[in-house]
Amino acid sequence: MLRIAIAKGRLMDSLINYLDVIEYTTLSETLKNRERQLLLSVDNIECILVKGSDVPIYVEQGMADIGIVGSDILDERQYNVNNLLNMPFGACHFAVAAKPETTNYRKIATSYVHTAETYFKSKGIDVELIKLNGSVELACVVDMVDGIVDIVQTGTTLKANGLVEKQHISDINARLITNKAAYFKKSQLIEQFIRSLEVSIANA
């Protein structure tokens, strides 16, 4: 049995779409037909559905052998896991966004403090970072901050709130991570699962 931690929300939707494309029907249908279950079983796989930021923790602690998580989570802090493969779905990017007329930044709201701090330091810009846990666009709309650093996929949310993308920071994609011990103890099962996703180890 292989236990896989999967990030709920947008990334899981991207995973399901990808599974449909490669016709991995059993796993796709199991994820689609979940109700409120957080633990699902199919074939020789057990899926645990958790918040994105918790995926590497479950893997690190040995509660999951494999994790599928956005690279944004892995960029924010170090985890003792094997950061194994790029996955061909879940593409988006970090960006600085603000009102169209904004040209200078003193305060920035973000859920991704490390990414924002690294970016502005690299540009030699001294900003005050305010950490928020969601709806960072609102902080800019009500003028609490001059701009935000957030994940952008289509830009629809920015546009709906009267904001525009100012600078592209870095690309984000889904990553496959493994528990370090499980990578050796369950190498055959892990490699079999990777093959079933039609992903090559060359994508590391």
Curated annotation (Swiss-Prot):
Q: List the disulfide bonds.
A: none
Q: Which CDD domains match?
A: PBP2_HisGs
Q: Where in the cell is it found?
A: Cytoplasm
Enzyme Commission (EC) number: 2.4.2.17
Q: Which cellular component, as a GO term, is one annotated location?
A: cytoplasm
Single GO biological process annotation from the record: L-histidine biosynthetic process
Q: Which InterPro entries match?
A: ATP_PRibTrfase_cat (IPR013820), ATP_PRibTrfase_HisG (IPR001348), ATP_PRibTrfase_HisG_short (IPR024893)
A single Gene Ontology molecular function, please? ATP binding
- So what does this thing catalyse? 1-(5-phospho-beta-D-ribosyl)-ATP + diphosphate = 5-phospho-alpha-D-ribose 1-diphosphate + ATP
Q: In which pathway does it act?
A: Amino-acid biosynthesis; L-histidine biosynthesis; L-histidine from 5-phospho-alpha-D-ribose 1-diphosphate: step 1/9
Report the top EC class in one word. Answer: transferase
Identify the keywords attached in UniProt to this record, alphabetized.
Amino-acid biosynthesis, ATP-binding, Cytoplasm, Glycosyltransferase, Histidine biosynthesis, Nucleotide-binding, Transferase
* Domain-related comment: Lacks the C-terminal regulatory region which is replaced by HisZ.
Similarity field: Belongs to the ATP phosphoribosyltransferase family. Short subfamily.
Q: What does this protein do?
A: Catalyzes the condensation of ATP and 5-phosphoribose 1-diphosphate to form N'-(5'-phosphoribosyl)-ATP (PR-ATP). Has a crucial role in the pathway because the rate of histidine biosynthesis seems to be controlled primarily by regulation of HisG enzymatic activity.
Complexes and interactors: Heteromultimer composed of HisG and HisZ subunits.
Protein's recorded name: ATP phosphoribosyltransferase
